[in-house]
């Protein structure tokens, strides 16, 4: 490997908006501010919403259904 061509790989601090602080190693060179992390992301916390919206056929049937037919 050639010397002097690789970026510095150093320890930085990544701070999440929820207050979680992590020490990570990166070539970025400055501290990071994150929007979400593993402690506050809905997928990892189990508070994920199921957004099961109907498709075009469901909207059509809802709009043009005859009242009292079901």
From Swiss-Prot:
Disulfide bonds: none annotated. SUPFAM superfamilies: L28p-like. One of its GO terms (molecular function) is metal ion binding. GO terms for cellular component: ribonucleoprotein complex; ribosome. Gene3D superfamilies: Ribosomal protein L31 (4.10.830.30). Keywords: Metal-binding, Ribonucleoprotein, Ribosomal protein, RNA-binding, rRNA-binding, Zinc. Binds the 23S rRNA. PANTHER family: 50S RIBOSOMAL PROTEIN L31, CHLOROPLASTIC (PTHR33280), LARGE RIBOSOMAL SUBUNIT PROTEIN BL31A (PTHR33280:SF6). Part of the 50S ribosomal subunit. This is Large ribosomal subunit protein bL31. It comes from Klebsiella pneumoniae (strain 342).
